[in-house]
Amino acid sequence: MTTERSDPTALALRLLARREYGRRELGDKLLRAGCDAGDVALALDALAAAGYQDDARYVEMLTRTRVRQGHGPLRLRQDLQRAGIEVGADPEIDWLQQAQAVCRKRFGNTPPADARDYARRARFLAGRGFTGETIRQVLGAGRERDFAAD
């Protein structure tokens, strides 16, 4: 009789019933659970062939989640690389609009009051994973030069 620990397919199905996983992430979980590496590879191939595990679907789910959480393209790319997914073309998302919404939610509609406020907002957006160009567009191109005289 095989237990769930020794049956990677059953364990993988239980994990996939809760949420999507990338192939490498799911394989790592199965290996940590004590499953044999050869059995894990076979189980992952079978699950992918049956349509239970799909990296493209995982990328879509992760993209939706990160956008909803207010993260930018750099953070999304980092999360995909961490999950072992080849980073292809950027999804069709208006990152400028996303960054504006995140900034507006955090700081309101007022522009940065001074250089210190500008830097604080820029750090916040950079920490969320937005590019420097997007940050400059959101905070107002040239505004950092206006504050240099302060």
Curated annotation (Swiss-Prot):
Which Pfam families does this chain map to? RecX_HTH1, RecX_HTH2, RecX_HTH3
Gene Ontology biological process: regulation of DNA repair
Coiled-coil ranges from the UniProt annotation: none
The answer, when asked if Cytoplasm is one of the entry's keywords, is: yes
TM segment ranges: none
Q: What is its main location?
A: cytoplasm
Keyword hit for Transcription: no
| GO CC annotations, alphabetized | cytoplasm
Where in the cell is the protein located? Cytoplasm
Kindly state which keywords UniProt assigns to this record, in alphabetical order.
Cytoplasm
Task: Identify its protein family.
Answer: Belongs to the RecX family.
* Function summary: Modulates RecA activity.
What is this protein's name? Regulatory protein RecX
Source organism per entry reads: Acidithiobacillus ferrooxidans (strain ATCC 23270 / DSM 14882 / CIP 104768 / NCIMB 8455)
